[in-house]
């Protein structure tokens, strides 16, 4: 029979199985844990409850604060307070900041309406500086001599009464006391146990403080309910040594434990290192069924890799169970028991958190509170017996947290897929908005940590937005824990540069970076940083001194190492760069590459225009290729000095020069230009990225007169930069055909081409090429550049039919969006040349028939042009699938978001680059 009150859990476990144990490891002690049976725990807690009942501050049914720094004390006094007829309220670790610590104690006192706290002698000092709460040392109570039979608690609880108070993390402000009832907790435990059956003679493993809902309910109380042993270890010992975590699971035949994503990654890394050792360790993990994971987003890649490793030691493949839960839901209540297969099958970068256990229901709603259909992002709401009913003494917060029809508003965003699985999208209140674009702070933090930046401590990175007085948009603030010594200024500057570049790549915005000492970056018992608390401290000015010192040291370093202009021309250009990018000389000198400051294609064009105005050019006479090939002030000055000297055409444009992997070569679309690749290249930091640009843009250049002419030019360009393979080439639209032909030529000459990518182009294109005359090429170019809409381009195709080129050109210029036209620094002569290049590229492909084969091909397909196919499935299955006729292995297809003209544009480039990088890796590149 299911117990209805929490004390019954311990009483039943003690009576049913006197040998069931709580096994406790103290800090630093790995060999000799303390073991206490459930029967002995009940006897000890009963004695302690007498001391609680007899204390002068005792009030039946009231909340009693508990503040201890070890598992045993928390467990004993949790039960003592319950058995005394009171409500235990377990506090998290107090802040190291005296001001914050006092404020927190005063807040706890007013919330709980209590003036005392049970603690240990060693922790009394933490209550200094305040009068709101009186610490009572349990060592002074003389409870060991009490008779367990003398407990005369007069309060008889009901299932709906509050059994336990736990505190929210405060991620949305001051912590709130969550009222968890007996019925709610028992319902939650029963629901959790039904998700994954656990073997007999196994145990639960906990490594976080009992103040966390996962430790007290998901481990301690659930183990009692399941009649299984439970093992408690200090978190710092486990996190510092993942191998010991594996030892514990094997030694105690652990069936259920938990680990957030950051710790899963550490376990994976430890196992990989173990496999490389001369004598690899082995573990029997055949009893392991359930590694719950939550508290932060789980990456499918990490879960997949670790699952495979754990499987080799006897665990099931689905042993890692990502989930969702809150203090308000008694920890995990939504679980994905099909990870990683489900997430891989659905192409999820971050795992789904699954479906509801018994006792809870979920829905996703819009801003009006209406439930949304599968696939649409909205607000996550929960209901059911497992969900709490109120925050203690906080009716305003309670009312705000529930809808009119009684659903709990979690504050998280998510979508439900067609199978009812939940995919989270971050907390609504944590979203960063920069210039109208929304970013997830977690994704920015992940991006920074995934780059393994030297000088930055993993898992101590926190990102948030802040609106400075007078600012029109928020700025991104990123704080981190450095690994370098405070006096190592070069490392300080290099770390800031590396972080800045990653954030710029992720958001297009330069971050405000502050290194902080560890005391200012406290973690919860689950190893999480509180974004809201850190943000609040920043906005209160608590990091101002650290920020000022950091800025001063880096500025001094820049001044000592910066390269100064050699002449007035370089000085003038440098001033233009600084003004265009809105940065200071401390951040940029004559030898800083422009792409290191996160420049995009629009900023590049604006820079070009500013330089032309500075030089007094009446027309746009500086080819964009000059800026693409000469990315520093010094290089550009030399290039401009030679601008009017005869220059041989070079198709190679360096978009990203760094990285130790083989380069990626990107071939222009039908417009011939490579600006479309600039945003994509910013995300590819592990290898150089080169683009191949068509001939004919510069004054005096003639466009290609045949496919062979273009292929030979591009082949020579590739060989000049990368003499040896393996090669990776990809083309966007029209460029896919050229990438295919260049790949064939490389293979014919004995080179290995390991990756050929087609961005949304089928192999047979000549009929489409023949349809595009000069007018159509110009109209497509105008639409591609966002000068006119697609609808208007189709209308103009009819209206301008039969007119001469000059008339057509002027008509399109007249129709063009004037702001966009100016933004792109276009001129009539240059737009005309651009149309010539596009037309000649299409003309020479009018008789193109693909032949031959390459080793492999990856096709990235998006929503096609309406004229090309009626649907995405038709596009893939009928047209793109024909690439199979021209490869020596089956084509790999990659479904990417967006439409043909937007698939690598700003809206979709972040998703596209992740798919592209994964495809490169799968090809061994």
From Swiss-Prot:
Primary role: Nonribosomal peptide synthase; part of the gene cluster that mediates the biosynthesis of Asp-melanin, a pigment that confers resistance against UV light and hampers phagocytosis by soil amoeba. The nonribosomal peptide synthase melA converts 4-hydroxyphenylpyruvate (4-HPPA) to aspulvinone E. The tyrosinase tyrP then performs hydroxylations of both aromatic moieties of aspulvinone E. The product of tyrP is highly unstable, and, due to the high reactivity of methides and ortho-diquinones, the polymeric Asp-melanin forms spontaneously.
Gene knockout outcome: Results in white conidia.
Record key words, sorted: Cytoplasm, Phosphopantetheine, Phosphoprotein, Transferase
Designated name of the protein: Aspulvinone E synthetase melA
GO biological process terms, semicolon-separated: fatty acid biosynthetic process
Coiled-coil segments on the chain, per record: none
Residue ranges of domain Carrier in the record: 564-644
Pfam families noted in UniProt: AMP-binding, PP-binding, Thioesterase
Entry note about domains: AtrA has a A-T-TE domain architecture. The adenylation (A) domain recognizes and activates the aryl acid substrates, and loads them onto the thiolation (T) domain. The thioesterase (TE) domain shares the missing condensation (C) domain function, and is responsible for condensation and final product release.
Main location: cytoplasm
Domain of life: Eukaryota
InterPro entries in alphabetical order: AB_hydrolase_fold, ACP-like_sf, AMP-bd_C_sf, AMP-binding_CS, AMP-dep_synth/lig_dom, ANL_N_sf, PKS_PP-bd, PP-bd_ACP
Family indicated by similarity: Belongs to the NRP synthetase family.
EC number(s) per entry: 2.3.1.-
Cellular component aspect of the GO annotation: cytoplasm
């Amino acid at each position: 029979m299911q117990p209805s009150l929490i004390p019954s859990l311990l009483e039943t476990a003690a009576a049913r199985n006197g040998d069931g144990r709580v096994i406790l490891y103290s800090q630093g002690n790995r060999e000799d844990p303390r073991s206490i049976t459930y029967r002995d725990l009940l006897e000890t807690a009963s004695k302690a409850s007498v001391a609680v009942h007899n204390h002068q501050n005792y009030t039946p049914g009231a909340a009693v604060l508990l503040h201890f720094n070890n598992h045993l004390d928390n467990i004993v006094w949790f039960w003592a307070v319950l058995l005394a007829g009171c409500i235990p309220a377990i506090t998290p670790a107090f802040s190291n900041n005296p001001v914050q610590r006092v404020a927190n104690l005063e807040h706890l006192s007013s919330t709980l309406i209590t003036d005392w706290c049970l603690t240990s002698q060693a922790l009394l000092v933490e209550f200094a500086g305040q009068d709101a709460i009186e610490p009572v040392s349990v060592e002074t109570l003389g409870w060991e001599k009490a008779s367990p039979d003398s407990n005369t608690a007069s309060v008889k609880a009901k299932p709906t009464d509050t059994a336990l108070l736990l505190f929210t993390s405060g991620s949305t402000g001051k912590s709130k006391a969550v009222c968890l009832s007996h019925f709610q907790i028992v319902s939650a435990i029963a629901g959790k146990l039904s998700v994954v059956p656990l073997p007999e003679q196994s145990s639960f493993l906990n490594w976080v403080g009992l103040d966390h809902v996962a430790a007290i309910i998901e481990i301690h109380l659930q183990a009692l309910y399941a009649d299984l042993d439970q093992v408690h270890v200090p978190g710092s010992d486990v996190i510092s040594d993942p191998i010991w975590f594996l030892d514990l699971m094997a030694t105690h035949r652990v069936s259920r434990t938990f680990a957030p994503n950051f710790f899963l990654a550490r376990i994976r890394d430890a196992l990989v290192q173990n496999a490389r050792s001369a004598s690899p360790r082995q573990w029997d993990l055949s009893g392991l069924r359930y590694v719950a994971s939550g508290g932060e987003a789980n990456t499918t890649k990490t879960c997949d890799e670790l699952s495979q490793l754990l499987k080799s030691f006897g665990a099931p493949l689905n042993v890692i169970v990502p989930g969702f839960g809150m203090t308000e839901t008694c920890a995990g209540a939504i679980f994905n028991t099909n990870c990683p297969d489900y997430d891989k099958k659905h192409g999820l970068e971050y795992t789904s958190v699954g479906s509801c256990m018994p006792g809870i229901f979920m829905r996703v709603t819009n801003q009006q509170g209406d439930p949304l259909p599968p696939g649409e992002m909205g607000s996550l709401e929960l209901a059911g017996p497992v969900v709490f009913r109120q925050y203690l003494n906080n009716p305003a917060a309670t009312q705000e947290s529930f809808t009119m029809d009684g659903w709990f508003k979690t504050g998280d965003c998510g979508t439900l897929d067609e199978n009812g699985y939940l995919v989270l999208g971050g907390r609504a209140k944590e979203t960063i908005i920069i210039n109208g674009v929304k970013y997830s702070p977690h994704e920015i933090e992940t991006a920074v940590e995934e780059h393994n930046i030297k000088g930055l401590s993993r898992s101590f990175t926190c990102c948030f937005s802040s609106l400075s007085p007078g600012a029109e948009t928020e700025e991104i603030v990123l704080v981190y824990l450095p690994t370098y010594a405070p006096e190592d200024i070069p490392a300080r500057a290099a770390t800031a540069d590396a972080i800045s570049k990653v954030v710029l790549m992720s958001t297009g915005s330069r971050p405000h970076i502050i290194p902080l000492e560890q005391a200012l970056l406290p973690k919860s018992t689950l190893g999480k940083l509180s974004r809201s608390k850190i943000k609040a401290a920043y906005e209160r000015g608590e990091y101002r001194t650290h920020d000022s010192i950091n800025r001063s040291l880096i500025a001094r370093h820049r001044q000592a190492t910066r390269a100064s202009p050699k002449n007035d021309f370089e000085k003038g250009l440098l001033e233009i760069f600084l003004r265009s990018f809105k940065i200071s000389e401390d951040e940029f000198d004559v030898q800083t590459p422009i792409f290191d400051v996160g420049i995009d294609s629009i900023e590049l064009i604006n820079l070009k225009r500013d330089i032309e105005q500075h030089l007094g050019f009446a027309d746009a006479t500086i080819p964009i290729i000059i800026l693409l090939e000469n990315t520093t002030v010094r290089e550009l000055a030399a290039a401009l000095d030679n601008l009017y000297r005869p220059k041989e055409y070079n198709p190679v444009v360096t978009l990203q020069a760094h990285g130790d992997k083989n380069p990626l070569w990107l071939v222009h679309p039908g417009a011939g230009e490579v600006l479309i690749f600039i945003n994509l290249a910013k995300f590819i930091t592990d290898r150089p990225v080169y683009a191949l640009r068509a001939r004919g843009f510069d004054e005096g250049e003639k466009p290609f007169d045949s496919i062979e002419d273009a292929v030979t030019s591009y082949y020579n360009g590739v060989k000049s930069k990368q003499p040896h393979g393996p090669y990776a080439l990809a083309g966007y639209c029209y460029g896919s055909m050229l990438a295919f032909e260049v790949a064939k030529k490389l293979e014919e000459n004995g080179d290995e081409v390991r990756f050929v990518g087609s961005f949304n182009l089928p192999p047979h294109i000549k009929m489409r090429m023949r349809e595009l005359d000069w007018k159509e090429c110009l109209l497509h170019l105008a639409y591609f550049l966002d000068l006119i809409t697609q609808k208007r381009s189709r209308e103009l195709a009819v209206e301008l039919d039969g007119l001469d080129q000059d008339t057509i050109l002027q008509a399109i210029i007249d129709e063009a969006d004037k702001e966009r036209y100016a933004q792109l620094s276009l001129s009539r002569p240059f737009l005309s040349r651009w149309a010539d290049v596009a037309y000649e590229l299409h003309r020479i492909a009018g008789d193109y028939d693909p032949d031959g084969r390459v080793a492999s091909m990856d096709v990235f397909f998006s929503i096609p042009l309406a004229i090309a196919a009626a649907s995405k499935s038709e596009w893939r299955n009928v047209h793109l699938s024909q690439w199979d006729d021209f490869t020596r292995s089956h084509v790999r297809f990659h479904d990417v978001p967006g439409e043909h003209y937007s698939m690598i544009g700003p809206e979709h480039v972040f998703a596209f680059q992740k798919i592209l990088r994964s495809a490169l890796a799968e090809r061994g590149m």
